[in-house]
């Protein structure tokens, strides 16, 4: 667990730039560190922020390679916290906004799981 704490510390100190890939990935890595440290609300916030950053820097307004993946991670954590309505909203947003994203190919199974 100490390495995850160290990772979170270093990633919290990272200054994101205005790029489409590296900065959003670093913020998502912080989300992964928080998830391993069981700081789940912080993890969800980090994944949502990473998706937003990736979209903001994308020429199309939606980063199909990263954003859907980050939002699915956030949704899975929300499900683990029994926040299925919030997870469902994320999954539905993915289905609507990231139609052509590789990660969205199986989004229906996430939607179905969150509605049970």
Language model regions located:
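Short solvent-exposed coil/turn linkers within tandem alpha-helical repeat scaffolds
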Residues: 2, 16-24, 52-67, 94-107
């Amino acid at each position: 667990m100490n390495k995850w704490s160290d990772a979170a510390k270093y990633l919290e100190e990272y200054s994101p730039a205005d790029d489409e890939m590296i900065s959003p990935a670093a913020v998502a890595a912080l989300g992964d560190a928080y998830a391993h440290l069981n700081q789940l609300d912080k993890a969800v916030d980090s994944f949502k922020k990473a998706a937003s950053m990736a979209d903001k820097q994308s020429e199309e307004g939606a980063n199909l390679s990263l954003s859907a993946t980050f939002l699915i991670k956030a949704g899975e954590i929300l499900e683990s916290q029994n926040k299925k309505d919030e997870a469902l909203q994320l999954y539905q947003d993915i289905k609507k906004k990231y139609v052509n994203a590789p990660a969205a190919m199986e989004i229906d199974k996430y939607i179905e799981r969150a509605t049970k």
